[in-house]
């Protein structure tokens, strides 16, 4: 059994905003609130970034049109005692997806981590 850090991308819809910075703040806040309400405080929530297609420079993953924004969020969770990478992905999607119902999630990276930082917790 191994431990993994799983990174996911989420697409968050924010209505009635006029600026992308406001939309990003609302998205991070709402996602954090929903995770906290379901005792998932251990999930890290950050604004997502995407690369410029022309120069590759990173910029905020938010698109604003008609006072409605689609914000990309980066969610990270540590999974302990998983049988494989695929098992860690399923556990992560189940944990986060249960709290963030109706929010599209995509696994973007799975990294096997070293040993017993917090090995007594089992996220299954």
From Swiss-Prot:
It comes from the Archaea. Pfam families: DUF555. InterPro entries: UPF0212 (IPR007564). Belongs to the UPF0212 family. PANTHER family: UPF0212 PROTEIN MJ0068 (PTHR42199), UPF0212 PROTEIN TK1194 (PTHR42199:SF1). This is UPF0212 protein Hlac_0869. It comes from Halorubrum lacusprofundi (strain ATCC 49239 / DSM 5036 / JCM 8891 / ACAM 34). The lineage of its organism: Archaea, Methanobacteriati, Methanobacteriota, Stenosarchaea group, Halobacteria.
